[in-house]
Each structure stands twice: as structure tokens, then as C-alpha cells.
Amino acid sequence: MVRRLVSDWLSPFGQPRFRKPQQWACNLRPETSSETASDLPVQLREGIARSQAALLRQQNFEDGYWCCELRADTTLESDTIMLYNFLGRGNSPKVPRLARFIFDAQLPDGGWPIYKNGPAEISATVKAYWALKFAGYSPEHPSLAKAREKIDELGGIHKVNTYSKFYMALFGLYDWKGVPSIPPEIMVFPNWFYFNIYEISSWTRAIVVPLSIIWSERPKIDCPAQARLDELFPDSRRYAPLRETLPDKGFFSWTNFFLLWDKMLKTAEGRGPHWLRLWALRLAEDWILTRLKGSDGLGAIFPGIVNTIMALKCLGYSDHDPRLREQLRLLEDLEIDRGDKLEMEPCHSPVWDTAISLIALADSGLDRKHPAMVNAAQWLLSKEIRRAGDWRIKNTEGPIGGWAFEFNNEFYPDIDDTAMVMLALRHVDLDENLTLRREKACLRGLHWLLSMQSRNGGWAAFDKDNTKQIFCKIPFADHNAMIDPPTADITGRVL
């Protein structure tokens, strides 16, 4: 099939069939841009022109890309405050600004949501409450009193997710008995084994591998008296057994199977064999350090960066180690200055933003030879990934190619961005040299996309055949994104 598609793509002489890129672009889109612009109402034409001008003003014209703000929920600001206290930097001048952002995002009912206009969510609310206490807010403050009422209404502190319990346990606020086990020995499982780290989603790997190091070391961080959460515990019990916090699926269920394993792991913890633990820790450390090369942090995402910082500290890295300092710098790069407030981004989105901006400008009638268009196309071509990443584990014969979402994320090109970039590049008129370069890059991208199709016919975000639902039954899978199955929207864009 690949050969047939390639032969359709190229002429018999091996050169791109479409010498004039606008011919191909017209085949891929309705011919509505400049051809019919004169038929549009004056107000609409003026509105389009203003929108084009506004979009062009936002371009980084020196390099050619667009990168707009990527908004998330307040768990990012809460986790950043937690991290500063983990590092002994709780008096950072950034903490009050982060806290102000969290404070202003509180809902009228006292809680905090995880998406815009959404309802209060228990983990986000507990994290926000804790972060505000770290920042010096009194538990008697009316907003915190209201938050406590909402926490009780949502089921109480024991209903928070695994990662929230994990962070609280680091400060001695939650008993490790109530935190699901994430042993580093998961790194020892070979890739052919049914349960291995490449059967979970790429973003979960970026979170779990560093957490496995932290779980093994379990440092006890002194919690400031002002940040203790005694008032959130209804009794003296500092944890809830996992069986109480997970939905009941009956005695014979995968959930209970994994709960049994969790109990066995906790019983065996600290009893050896110690060489296996040391080996697993070394594998986890090497895995992380390898994926920091050519990337803006582990997975180039906020949770990966935060957990990597804590994992490196647990392994004894000094504050002056260049690898640790680089992760702290990358975390600072995710800051959005809001004056007296500080917001955090989950990651940067330049490749996606540039691709959709090109398509919007071209389809709205901007000259396809416009310098801004050409500059953006060149930047996208420079961001093509030319090394094998984690996807290679389950796609052993696929060619190298594709694009990632962020500025630098060489181990994790994604299918959605690759498809969008290939569409965008067809919307720009380039000179002969750039056209040839584009054809080669798009051909590599096509090969890669075809090789990433899952057995069920669809395409996922980062991996192929990442569909083992059993992983969603693991106790620490409560973030509801444990696997990376094909989806309709990504498959549609690929097609």
C-alpha cells in the first residue's frame, strides 16, 4: 500500500508531480480564498483583513512561528508552589503571585474546576487549598472556609487522585499506605512482556517513571506548620485503604487483582532483593536522562518536568547540577506573567499553532507567497523530527519522520501535529529548493503516518496499538488517561 501511495505521489521520474504547490493546495481545499473574495460582503472582507492583520502581528517573524498561550487549570500553579516548598524555596517571590492566580480562580461555591466553566473538582480544590496555605493564607479566611465546605461536599480529602496523595505523602500529610505503589521495578520488564511501560500512554510514562524513583526513595519533606491539613481529616486516620477509594467491581475483577498486587508490593518493600531495586533505579534514571536530550523536559510537558526535578533531587543531584538547573529553567519558561499574578502553561504549542495559522491565513485569502507564510513554512520544515523515539518500540519497522507539538520534543512526535503540518505546508507557495525540501519531508511524514496506524484501523496521538484496557484498572490509573487508543478526530484529520 505504501508503494502505491508513493507512486501516486511522485512522477515516474522520481520528482514531485506537483511542480506548482498551489495546484495541490487547490485539490485539497475548496477554491474560495482570493478567487471569491470580491463576492463577499464588505463587512466580512474587512473583518477577515483585520483578523489576518491581528494574526500576523502575533507571529514571531524572526523565526516564523506562532505560539499562543495554552491555558490549563490551577493544579499547575498549585503543583508549582508545592515544588518550591519541596526544594526549600517556599519563600520565593513567585509564590504569592501563583497564589493570587489560584485565589482569583475560585468558583462561587468554594471549589476549583479542571476546565473552563466546569464544576468544582476534588483534587483541584484540595491542591488549591493546600497551595494557598503554603502561601500564608489562614484557614479562617472566608475563601478557605468555603473551600473546606466544598471539599466535604465532594467526598473529603481521601477522594483526591493518586498524584495528589503522592505529593501530600512527601510532606508527611498523607500516609504512604493509602498511596498506590509505583515501584521502579516496572523498568525491568522487557518490552515483549505484557505489562511494560510502553503499553501505557507516552504522557503517563513521563509522569510515572520519575514518580517510581520518588516512591522508592520517599523523602520526608518538612511541611511548614501553616501548610498542614489537619482540618481536612475527619478523624485521626491519615489515609483511606485503596479498596475504599476505588469503585467496587466485584470480588473477581482486575481492580481487585491489582489491589492484591499493591498489597504484596508494600509488604515486600524494603526486604530486597536490593540489587534489583538498585538496577531498577539506574534504569529509570537512564531512561529519564536519555529523553531529556533534544527535548524541553521529559515529554516537554509540565508534569514530566516537575516530577523529573523531584526525582533528580531524590537521586542526590545537587542544586548546581546542570541537568537539574536546566529543568528549573524549562519550568520557568512555562510561566505567563500576569502582573501581580503568575500563571503556568502545561507546555508550549508552536508547531500546532503555526500549522493552523498557515491554513487560516491561506484559506482566508492571504497571498500564499507572503513572506510570513514562507517564513512559517521554513520554520515548520526545520522542526521535522529525524530520530526514533518511544514510538519505535511498538513500530519497529516504521520510517523516521513527523512533527511534535512543542518546540523540542524529539522522542515524542505525534500523529495529529504531523497530519496538520502536512496540510499546512500545502497552503504555501515556495521556491524550487524549498518545494523539494517540503516534498521530501511530507513524504517521510506520510510514510510515518501510515506506519503508525493501529490494528483497529484508527490513529492515536503518539503510539500505535496502545489499547490494553487492563491498564486502566491499575490503582494509580485514576487520572483517566492511562492508555493512548485511536480516536475519531485524529483519524479524521489523518484521512
Where are these regions (language model features)?
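Preference for long, amphipathic alpha-helical scaffolds in soluble/luminal domains
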Residues: 2-495
